[in-house]
Amino acid sequence: RQRRRRIKARRRIKRWRRRRIERRRWIEHATADR
């Protein structure tokens, strides 16, 4: 049971990493505008 949960968490992390990169660019743009 734990091994399957770890695989699911790893797949979620990969999707979060792509969204985090996009959010980081958004935050950088907001700070530069300030």
Curated annotation (Swiss-Prot):
Species in which this protein is naturally found: Pseudotsuga menziesii
Protein's name according to its UniProt entry: Unknown protein 5
Source lineage: Eukaryota, Viridiplantae, Streptophyta, Embryophyta, Tracheophyta
